[in-house]
A protein has these predicted regions:
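Midchain, well-structured core segments that form catalytic/ion-binding scaffolds
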Residues: 1-89
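A structural signal for short secondary-structure junctions
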Residues: 6-8, 52-54, 72-75, 107-109, ...
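Flexible, glycine/charged-enriched surface loops at secondary-structure junctions
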Residues: 25, 47-60, 105-117, 144-149
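A short beta-alpha structural unit
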Residues: 59-69, 79-86, 112-131, 157
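Extended hydrophobic-aromatic, low-complexity segments
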Residues: 72, 90-94, 145-148
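Short amphipathic alpha-helices in soluble, non-transmembrane regions
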Residues: 94-103
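Catalytic-core signal marking the mid-to-C-terminal active-site face
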Residues: 103, 132-148, 171-172
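Zn-dependent metallopeptidase/amidohydrolase metal-coordination segment
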Residues: 145-172
Length: 172
């Protein structure tokens, strides 16, 4: 594969506060279950690319649940959100949409929420001349090639800031 560049990466931390109680004596109505709120939010993250019109990926890759006991209603959850797109503005709009969804869920479930951006790297379009030359070279050598974007972060995104850059992906 020959990527035209690297997607932007936007990382966020989300923390929810609930109310820990014993499972048995606590009625379902009125619970402030931080894990249930997080579960709803995680589904929203998974649905986000379709809602935003595609050409984007998003995931929750990390979650901590406290006290993480089978007989205690969770009172704290921390999870991460990773949004990637070729369009930086679209990724920011996607996060704004999620923030509104998350806030509504937190209010409905009585679980105060804190959200924080932890890392952002803008998309990195590679040098058109170099990318074209890599594609031409593959053709000249009779090698298959695929013009694409890189969804993973690479050092090349930083090299791209100081010099013309291109990458070659080899199937593994």
């Amino acid at each position: 594969g020959v990527p035209k560049g690297i997607l932007c990466l936007h990382w966020y931390d989300v923390c929810l506060e609930g109310e820990a109680n014993q499972v048995g004596p606590t009625p379902m109505a009125g619970r402030h279950d931080a894990l249930c709120a997080a579960a709803e939010m995680i589904i929203k993250v998974n649905e986000l690319p379709d809602r935003m019109g595609g050409n984007m990926v998003a995931t929750v890759g990390e979650i901590q649940n406290y006290p993480n006991s089978r007989n205690i209603i969770p009172d704290k959850v921390h999870f991460t959100v990773d949004i990637r797109s070729w369009d930086d503005d679209k990724a920011l709009r996607a996060w704004d949409s999620l923030k509104a969804d998350f806030q509504a869920i937190a209010e409905r479930r009585g679980t105060p929420i804190r959200m924080e951006e932890t890392w952002r790297v803008e998309h990195a379009p590679f040098d058109d001349r170099l990318v074209k030359r890599v594609l031409e070279s593959a053709d000249e050598l009779g090698l298959s090639n695929y013009y694409m974007v890189s969804g993973a972060g690479h050092d090349a995104s930083y090299m791209n800031q100081i010099c013309p850059t291109a990458m070659v992906f080899v199937p593994s």
